[in-house]
Amino acid sequence: MNNTGQHGKFEKINDEFLNETFGAFEVLEAIQTKYGKTDNDTIINEARDAMVAKVLGYGNVNTDKHGWDAKMDSEEFLEVKQSSASAGHICATFNDTSLEKAEELGKDNVTIALAVWSSLRNLLFVVYGKNRKIGPDMKAKIITAKEKGHIRPGTQSISMNDLLFKYGFKIKLVNMKKEDIREFLKNKSGFKTYLIKENRQLPFYDEA
C-alpha cells in the first residue's frame, strides 16, 4: 500500500517569506481594486499575456477567461502559453481543449506563442508561429487519449523542440542573449539530440 504521507517536501513555515510575500500581495491587491480585476487566478495571467502580446505586436488582450488570449485590430489572434525557465521540459500545454478548439489552432489567422519566464516578471524569450498541421495533430492526440480512457483527454502539450523543428516556429529574444540560449536549452528535455548530436541551429526571428 502506498503511503501518501511520503509524498512532497515538507519544510517549517518561514515567517519572513510569508510576511514579505503578503506584503507584495498588498500591492497587487491595490492594483486589483483599482482596475476591478478581483479574480486571483487570472490577474497575473492577464498581465503576462498582455506583455507577450505587446512584445509580438498585438494591441488587444482578452480580459475574459474564454477565447484567444490577444488579437490585433484585424482578425489576427494570439494563443499564449507560459512556461518556467526552471522546468526540465519546456512545452506549450493546452488545457481542456475541445476538438473544435484543437482544429482552430491550425487556422491561418491564429498564432501560437510559448513564453518562457525566469521569474514572475522576467520574460526571457518567446517561441511563436503558426502551422496548419497543428490543428489536425492536436485533434488526433485528443481522440487517441479519449480512446485510451484518459481522464482529461483535452489536456495536451506540444514540446518547444517540436514547435521549432517540426512546426517551423522561431524564437524572439526578449531578456536573453543569443549566445546564451543554446547553452540554456542543451540541458532541457528533447534538445540534446537536436543541439548536440545533430548540431541543429536554432531559428530566430531576426534571421531570414
What are the residue ranges of the model-derived segments?
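Nucleic-acid endonuclease domains
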Residues: 1-208
